[in-house]
Each structure stands twice: as structure tokens, then as C-alpha cells.
Amino acid sequence: MLIPYDQLEAETLTRLIEDFVTRDGTDNGDDTPLETRVLRVRQALAKGQAFILFDMESQQCQLLARHEVPRELLD
């Protein structure tokens, strides 16, 4: 199920994004400051280029690029 980013509390959204951008393998040696990486994800969410997916089975949220989201969830 897709979760509209603007329906999350601000602190919850920030923590979700920070968790995503600080995971192993997501920085690829990028020395960009955390605040900048968080801002980029926020902008992608606002533009519809990224989405928050809640997996009912695992009870976890994931941030996905638009092309990674199952098509049936975007319709």
C-alpha cells in the first residue's frame, strides 16, 4: 500500500528519509551532507518521483523510486 508522504507527521517522515539515506549501500561514497540528501528525497516525494510503500507482511516502510513501484499500485 502506498502511503502519501504528506499524511505522515513531519518527524516520522524525516526519520524515515534519514534511515533510507544513511543505509549501507545508499551513499556510494557520496560525501553530500545528510541534510542535502534528505532534501533531495523530500523533493522526489513531492514531485511524484518517489513513493513510500508499506509492506503489510513485514510491517515495514520502504522508499521506492517511481519505476520500482508495482504498476497496479500507481493506477
From Swiss-Prot:
Pfam families: UPF0270 (PF06794). InterPro entries: UPF0270, YehU-like_sf. It comes from the Bacteria. HAMAP family: UPF0270. Belongs to the UPF0270 family. This is UPF0270 protein PSEEN1465. It comes from Pseudomonas entomophila (strain L48).
